[in-house]
A protein has these predicted regions:
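N-terminal export signals
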Residues: 1-18
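Low-complexity, Ser/Thr/Pro/Gly-enriched N-terminal "stalk/linker" regions
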Residues: 17-100
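Well-ordered alpha-helical scaffold segments within catalytic/enzyme domains
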Residues: 43-56, 104-117, 176-191, 270-289, ...
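Extended, well-ordered alpha-helical scaffold segments
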Residues: 63, 117-133, 190-210, 279-310, ...
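Active-site-adjacent bridging/hinge elements
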Residues: 72-85, 148-157, 242-254, 424-430
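Aromatic-rich carbohydrate-recognition surfaces in CAZymes
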Residues: 95-231, 446-460
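Extended ligand-binding clefts on enzyme/binding-domain cores
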Residues: 99, 135, 139, 143-146, ...
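C-terminal capping/lid segments that line or modulate ligand- or cofactor-binding pockets
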Residues: 156-162, 167-169, 177, 333-354, ...
Length: 471
């Protein structure tokens, strides 16, 4: 499975064939055999065959073939349930489904649905399953494949039922679901996913967002954990640091699953603005729920205005920038974390143009030593976060840097670094040591693998000559 390297040949027949034999052996596909793959998509197999000849760099080509189908190869459980598709997707080396990860894991496959009906059913099944999950608990981030319980059952929170794996409140979990459903609908025009249950789930989403604006008090959600990692629990008996209600939405935890320091996490609020506008369009067009659609737009506009008023500040070096977290009282956090949504990813998720002046200032800040979680070493440079500790770079940040520029040399540099920091495994990882890429975390992390594949596809489509050259 993900992360297993293929050993080079220990005996070579002759020096004249050495380079050929080493290459032939080193870059053998690390995908499971066809009979061991969890799901096979004809369209995905076709795109892999089409793209490989367009990548000159042999190792990068090999990594694309390993990474792009990794979610389908290794993480999918697909079946029919009550005559509707039902899909459960684990993260990789953790056998639970995160709303965030599972949505992102299938995202690059969506444009291929037009050529593969089975793939479309699989993604519809994921939307159906996620809808069930949200109805169980909109505050949870990760779910079991049934009422199996979890080793986090001892967490101190209000609603830890057996279907939940982890109940950390993160805005982006709900946003990722809306993003997935909206894009599925946009590409297929299929409205079968928009059931009465889906609408009820979306009413729950909006209700949860509004509750976490904290206008009527601290709400109904708290979370604390008996642990030796401060970032795994919230302060003040699980309610988090105080916030002043200014229109922003509290997120108790970040997309890294680490506790927020100040409750208003700006990248996730940006994502909420985009998602609420998408939700409004669906509710208006598909359901004809005009009043609810207006409610979604009004909430999006309120959050957006609050981001611009309370979520930016003047940095002494970089100028006007976005804060990472604020509390509405005037306190803020100047940093970025690699996980998506991040400040770096704002254009990727549709909040702003990558040419926006405030974004460009922010980008310069977070990709520099002005960001306490920017690391640079012998192996590479990029953004990390407190989840795995100091001096560990997340490949996800390097991928996102490439997604948010039109500078071909910058993209080339990112691709080269991604190629050279796989620890010779052929896969992406959660993070790697800035001084030694062979020291990495999570050998089987499907989200990062698929995101890397998505980047390669974008480069092939947008800058085809770049991959036909030596990096």
């Amino acid at each position: 499975m993900g992360g297993l390297a293929v050993a080079a040949m220990s005996v070579r027949p002759s020096l004249s064939f050495a380079a050929f034999r080493e290459s032939e052996t080193k870059f053998v596909s690390l995908r499971p055999s066809i009979d061991k793959r969890r799901f096979v998509s004809r369209a995905v197999e076709v795109i892999i065959k089409e793209v490989k000849p367009k990548i000159k760099d042999e190792k990068l080509r090999w990594m694309f073939e390993n990474c792009f189908p990794n979610t389908l190869d290794t993480t999918v459980r697909y079946k029919m349930k009550n005559d509707r598709p039902d899909t459960f997707i684990i993260t990789g080396d953790i056998a639970a489904m995160w709303l965030r990860d599972s949505s992102a894991q299938v995202w690059p496959y969506l444009p291929l649905m037009k050529d593969d009906r089975d793939l479309q059913f699989l993604i519809a099944g994921l939307i159906n399953r996620q809808t069930e999950c949200i109805l169980i608990d909109p505050y949870a981030i990760a779910f079991n494949d049934g009422p199996l319980g979890s080793y986090w059952e001892t967490d101190h929170t209000q609603h830890m039922v057996k279907e939940l794996h982890e109940r950390k409140w993160e805005i982006e979990s709900l946003c990722y679901h809306i993003r997935l459903a909206y894009q599925y609908w946009t590409l297929t025009k299929d409205t079968s996913i928009f059931s009465a249950d889906w609408h009820e789930a979306m009413k729950l989403v909006v209700r949860t967002f509004k509750e976490q604006q904290r206008k009527q008090g601290i709400g109904t959600y708290s979370f604390s954990r008996d642990c030796d990692r401060p970032t795994d629990s919230q302060i003040n008996n699980g309610w988090g640091a105080p916030v002043k209600p200014v229109g922003l939405i509290v997120s108790s935890f970040r997309p890294s699953d680490d506790a927020t320091q100040f409750g208003f996490l700006i990248p996730s609020n940006m994502f909420a603005v985009v998602s609420l506008r998408q939700l409004s369009e669906i509710e208006h067009t598909v359901y004809n729920h005009i009043d609810f659609a207006k409610e979604c737009i009004a909430l999006a506009d309120e959050v957006d205005a609050a981001i611009r008023r309370y979520g930016t500040f003047n940095h002494p070096i970089c100028g006007r920038v976005y804060a990472f977290e604020v509390d509405g009282f005037g306190n803020g956090l100047c940093m970025d974390d690699a996980n998506i949504p991040s400040l770096l990813s704002a254009p990727y998720l549709g909040y702003c143009s990558f040419k926006d002046a405030v974004y460009q200032n922010t980008r310069k800040l977070i990709w520099s030593d002005n960001n306490p979680y920017f690391f640079k070493g012998k192996a590479g440079e990029g953004i990390g976060g407190p989840h795995v500790g100091l001096n560990y770079i997340w490949p996800m940040s390097i991928i996102m840097k490439a997604f948010t520029t039109d500078d071909e040399e910058e993209i080339r540099s990112c691709l080269k670094q991604l190629r050279d920091t796989d620890g010779e495994t052929g896969f992406m990882h959660e993070s790697f040591n800035a001084e030694n890429a062979a020291d990495f975390t999570r050998p089987w992390f499907a989200w990062a693998n698929t995101l890397f594949g998505e980047l390669i596809l974008k480069v092939v489509q947008t800058y085809p000559n770049l991959l036909l050259q030596t990096l």
